[in-house]
Structure formats: C-alpha cells, structure tokens
Amino acid sequence: MYRKKKLLALLLALAMLLCACGGQPAQEPETPETPEEAPYAFTLEYHRCAPLVEQQIGSDLVAAARQVIDAFLAGETAVMLPEGDYGGNPGNDLGYALNSMCPAFGAVTDYDDNRFDKATRTVTWAYTRTPEQVQEVLTALERTTVDCMSLLRQGDGETARALLLYRALTEQAAYDYDVSGTYDDDPAAYRFHTSSYSALVLHSGICYSFAQALAFLYTQAELDCAAVMGDSETAGLHMWLMAAINGKWYYLDPTWDVGGGWYYFGMTAEDRATWAGEFTGAALLGQDAAQLADLSDTRFSAVNCHWWTDMTIDRQAGQAVFTAAEDEKTVLPLN
C-alpha cells in the first residue's frame, strides 16, 4: 500500500510539472513575413477612380459613376442623379470613367452617350446578357483581378506594381484583328469583345480595350493614370495610357506590347512623337495631355525601345532586372 501511495504521489507531481510547462516542448515563435514576402493587401473596389480622371470629369460625375455601378451590381437599369455639374458631354465622360472603374458594365450593357439625359439627370441602360451571364462576368472579373494583384507584395512601390501589372495584362494577350468584320451586325457582341473586360479576362481586344484594362488595374493598385487618344499618319487613331510612377508621368502602350514585353513602357512624349508611332499629340477627353503633366522624364529609356524576353523583380536588391537573348540585361532601380 505504501508503495502504491508513493507511486501515485510521484505521478501526480509529474502531471503538475507537465501542466506547468504546457506538456509540450517550447516552440519557436513564428517569424512575421517581411514586406518583400507578405501578400499585397488588396480588396476589389469598383468605386475607385484615378485622381487624374476625377480632375478631368469632376467630382459630381465620379459620384454619378459610383451610383451607376451600385445600381448595375444590384441588377437595376436606371439611376436618377442628384443636382450637380454635368456640363460638356457628360454621357461620354461618364462612360469613359466607368470603363476604368468597372469593366463589366461596358461589357454587358448597351450604355452609350445618349443614355445620359441631362434634362432629367437620368442614366439608363439595358443588359445584353442574362442575369446569370452577368454574374459569371462579374465573378470572372473578380477572379482575374485578384490573380493579377496576387503578383504584388506588401512592400512593392509604384515602379514594381506598374511593371508587374503591365506584364500581367500583356503577357498572354493578343490583338483581335477580326473584331470589326466579325461583329459588324451584332453590336452587343462587338461591345463585349472590345471592352476592357475582354482584355482582362479573355486576353483579347483592341487598343481601347487594353488601355482601359491597364487603367483599371493601375487604379485598383492606387496608381494615378488615365487613357489618352492620339492620331498619326503612320499608325492612325490609337489609345494608350499615361500614368504616374514615383511622382513622374509616362506613356505606356499595352496594346503594342501584347504577347509580353516593355518596348513601349515608360515612354516620354518625345518618344511617342518619334520612334513610338509618330503621335505628335495626345488628348484626355479633349484636353491636351502635355498640358496636364510633364511627360519628359527618361527614367525608363534603358528599358523601352528594346525587346526584353523577361523581367524579374529583385525585392531584396531593390531593382528590376530585364534580360534578353545572349545574356543581355539591364538593371532598373525600383526607387
């Protein structure tokens, strides 16, 4: 009996010791991810509008765009806007903003300039797809956007974000040379296949599609930007992007870089007027782009006008490394 009591006491003491120690070996505390490794904090928000776009169309029209988007997401077909400044061509300006804020809207509705009634402050549209198809489009757009943003990291600055999202859009893309002839008798199909949604999700479109698609991605990643139009004798009417990267403004042409590359990334206005298509001017909703921003910075001159085959973001070294055939490479500081 004495031995049993002694054994029981020893077991009880051992149990108390294990409880005090947690009963498990000590574990190393988890090391938090560094900004270079942690995912980019992102939430899809269709209300986001680039500052330059808001500067051009005004805060009242941006508020109108947000009201239209909310109604669209709710399956409605009209909104009545509050009193505000809707001068000029508000129908066109509203459509322009919507394409870079909510690409699905232009893809699955028949909205055009005439759907904005200034007299009644009413915006109307009809759906060109069934409710189920509209939901499929929204789901695909969200999935694609999240996939693009997953390439970014918490510590990525504006240069890294701009480069990575540019590649995400262009790498798998192809220009749709058949769109005009294929959908001449089907306006709904034409709108769908030339929308910024098509460029993002289907990796196909025309210049308008890719410029506004890049504007959407950059706006979601909080990069200021706006799509601009230009015309030249050699290239014809064309749309591309102007964007601010680390406080400087540049031209970017994702359409001419479809298939991957940075040949037309980070151009100056002089580049655009010479080797990059001879576009001697560009306009943002009728406003001369050269009057809106200084487009003379040559930071990306070592990158553009060259066929690079790959680009790697070295976050530890703070640089982007561009490589080409025969081990040719150039290094671009990210800051």
Predicted regions and their residues:
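Hydrophobic/aromatic-rich core segments of domains that either
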Residues: 209-276
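A short, highly charged nucleic-acid-interacting micro-segment common to nuclease
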Residues: 196-210
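Secondary-structure boundary elements
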Residues: 133-199
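Bacterial N-terminal signal peptides that target proteins for export
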Residues: 1-11
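C-terminal motif of bacterial Sec signal peptides marking the signal peptidase cleavage site
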Residues: 17-20
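N-terminal accessory/pre-domain segments preceding catalytic cores
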Residues: 22-157, 163, 276-335
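Alpha-helix capping and helix-loop boundary segments enriched in small/acidic/polar residues
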Residues: 56, 67-68, 202-205, 229-232
